[in-house]
Every structure is written in C-alpha cells, then in structure tokens.
C-alpha cells in the first residue's frame, strides 16, 4: 500500500519522491507482494525486477477476497470473508473492516510465498491481534472502546470509514496530533474527524516541545474547514480526555482513541513518562465500577 504520508520537513519533499524511494524496494527483492487495488501500485512498480504476487478485491488478484461480512458485539469487532484465486479458504479476522481484509490478504499471500501450510495460515489469521491497531478494550457492555495508531488524515479516514460501517449509535473520536511534526497532519485529521465523527474530543499526543494550545488551534482550523457545526470539546490532558470519553459514553457508542496505539509513553518537553492507555482505561473502569 502507498499513501501520502511522511511528507514534510525532515522527511520527503513530495509524494512523488516518497513513491520513487519506496519503489526501490521492488528492484532489490526477489518477490514483491502488492495490493492490486491501490491506485499507486502501477507507478510504484515501474521498473520492478522482482516476481509479483498480488492481492485485493479485483478479479485480477492472485489472492482475492469475496463475500465480506462485518461482525460486532460489545467486545468484538471483526470480519469474515472467502479467499479465492490461487487459494480457496474461509477466513475470520479479529479486526474490523475493509483494511483488515487487505491486511489479512497480504499476510496470507506472504505465508503462501514462504510455503506455510494452509492450516497454519488459517489459524494465525483467526488468532491475530495487533497491539494498538483497532485494539478493543472491553470495559463495558454498554459501549465499545478501542485504541488505534491512526495518526494522519489517510489512516484516520480509513479507520472511521471502517467503524462507521458497523452502524454505532455515535462514533466518538479521542485524538490529538504530535508536536514538532507537519501541521498538515493537524489540519487533515481535524477536517476528517469533523466530517466523519459524531463527536470529537481534542487532546494531546506527544506535544514534545510545542505548546498544546498551539497544536489544538491548528486542529481547530481543520475542524472548522471540515464541518463548521462539528461537535467537539477540548481537553488538553489526555488522561482527563479518556475519563471524559468513558463518563459521557452512551449506549451503543463506538469510541476510537487514536494516535498513540501501541505506544507506552507520553512526551512533554522531551520528557517521556509512562502512559499505557489500555491499562489507564481498565483502571478507571474498575475505579468507577463500570459495567
């Protein structure tokens, strides 16, 4: 997959430059496993020298997903589908949505290239949980809350599109943006959440050496562009924001806490202190006697 990330000061100057460098991978490997549905795949593979294995929803894919079904309970979000093409297999994945289908297909294709038996691939996909990637924190039967590393416009839009497909009562997002990073991420995430979430809780996410007030001001610019009537609240301290999300959750809500995912720290003024969102949510739920 390829999307317009890692562009800005200290990274790549343009998307074209980023794509060019990433395309070098397919001139330096024996086998390339690629998403045939990605609009950038053709340009990415220009001049490739490796053998290609493709996956996707397209009829042309070597490993193709069909009959996708979304699955949800208060403590489970997942998807089931059938794989056809070079294989014939029913798959159930403990992670939700379209992007999980693509991730599972990619893993399956790599497994086949490496010669893994179908039984091992099937079992692995069924048990797979990626820490900080649509990671459910089952603290209540009333609502669903999850952690995800989405930290730019593209990944946020993909995640919210996925979660919206499960038809929650409200889609609530808790997010911030990193300090000393491109402001484009702040504008983009703000705009996306304003358009796609029912309610947003703006907070910190590794401020580093920037003031949280300045970061939130940039996010507001994106929010106002995306939807001037968007409903949101600003809570600078991320722990307070987590507590607010739990305290104000409604029956059937789906709450996405995004940006940090698997990270275990909070960075303020270059000082990193422990901050494990899963543990903090579990401790708070126990503290208030949440059911």
What are these regions (language model features)?
Residues 36-40, 57-58, 262:
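Short, polar loop motifs at secondary-structure junctions
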Residues 1-10, 42-90, 123, 128-133, ...:
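Extended acidic/charged loop-beta regions that coordinate divalent cations
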Residues 91-98:
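A short glycine-threonine-serine/GTX helix/turn-capping micro-motif
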Residues 49, 86, 106-119, 123, ...:
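ATP-dependent carboxylate-amine ligase
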Residues 99-100, 114:
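A conserved FAD-binding loop/helix module that cradles the flavin
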Residues 1-47:
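Flexible active-site lid/hinge loop adjacent to a nucleotide/diphosphate
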């Amino acid at each position: 997959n390829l999307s317009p990330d890692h562009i800005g000061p200290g990274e790549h100057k343009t998307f074209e430059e980023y794509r060019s460098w990433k395309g070098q991978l397919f001139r330096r490997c024996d086998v390339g496993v690629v998403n045939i549905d990605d609009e950038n795949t053709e340009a990415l593979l220009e001049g490739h020298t490796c053998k290609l294995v493709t996956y996707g929803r397209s009829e042309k894919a070597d490993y193709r997903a069909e009959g996708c079904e979304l699955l949800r309970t208060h403590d489970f979000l997942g998807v089931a589908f059938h794989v056809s093409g070079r294989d014939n297999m029913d798959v159930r994945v403990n992670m939700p949505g379209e992007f999980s289908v693509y991730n599972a297909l990619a893993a399956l294709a790599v497994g086949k290239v490496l010669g893994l038996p179908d039984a091992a691939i099937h079992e692995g996909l069924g048990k797979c949980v990626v820490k900080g990637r649509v990671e459910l924190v089952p603290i209540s039967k009333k609502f669903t809350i999850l952690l995800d590393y989405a930290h730019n416009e593209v990944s946020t839009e993909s995640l919210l599109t996925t979660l919206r497909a499960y038809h929650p009562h409200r889609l609530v997002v808790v997010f911030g943006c990193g300090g000393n990073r491109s402001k484009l991420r702040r504008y983009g995430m703000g705009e996306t959440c304003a358009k796609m979430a029912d309610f947003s809780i703006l907070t910190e996410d590794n401020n580093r050496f920037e003031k949280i007030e300045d970061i939130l001001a940039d996010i507001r610019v994106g929010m106002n562009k995306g939807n001037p009537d968007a409903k949101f609240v600003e809570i600078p301290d991320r722990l307070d924001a987590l507590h607010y999300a739990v305290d104000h959750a409604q029956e059937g809500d789906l709450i996405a806490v995004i940006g940090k995912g698997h990270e275990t720290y909070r960075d303020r003024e270059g000082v990193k202190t422990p901050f494990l969102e899963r543990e903090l949510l579990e401790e708070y739920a126990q503290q208030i006697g949440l059911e």
